[in-house]
Design a protein with these regions (language model features):
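Amphipathic, Lys/Arg-enriched alpha-helical "gate/interface" segment within cytosolic domains
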Residues: 1-135
Length: 135
């Protein structure tokens, strides 16, 4: 599995890309690298882009361990939002499972999106659902 972490200066969020074949060990390293990157600040909005990640071998135990690993980093996260970008239905379903498990213990909102534009809008408060929720 490969990954890249970039700061989107125009929109003020961190974007982490993954590609290749999923492994739980790589996922833990990926999450660690996000929160130890030069760009990370507590409370920074985060988009995790799974569009180029092969998820065919992911099982429930992998989702659970990834969620537990993220929960252990809760103190580094701070309040804010995490958008999961998943461009196919299998990725989206796995993302929703991860969301439901992680939300139990995280102090952050998590949402899953098919569209990068919708994910960015939600992260930056420009998405219709974000505006409606603030009313």
């Amino acid at each position: 599995m490969k990954w890249n972490i970039q700061f989107d200066q125009d929109n003020g969020f961190l974007r982490a890309y993954q590609s290749g074949n999923f492994t739980s060990a790589d996922q833990a390293s990926f999450l660690s690298d996000i929160f130890s990157s030069q760009f990370w600040q507590t409370g920074l909005p985060l988009m995790i882009d799974y569009c180029h990640l092969d998820v065919d071998n992911i099982r429930y135990g992998d989702i659970l361990s990834s969620s537990e690993f993220l929960t252990a980093l809760n103190g580094s996260l701070g309040p804010g939002k995490i958008a999961l970008l998943c461009d196919d239905d299998v990725q989206f379903g796995i993302g929703r499972q991860f969301q439901m498990i992680a939300l139990i213990h995280l102090d952050r909102e998590i949402a899953v999106f098919h569209s990068g534009r919708a994910a960015i809008g939600w992260l930056t408060g420009q998405h219709l659902a974000a505006r409606t929720a603030q009313v």
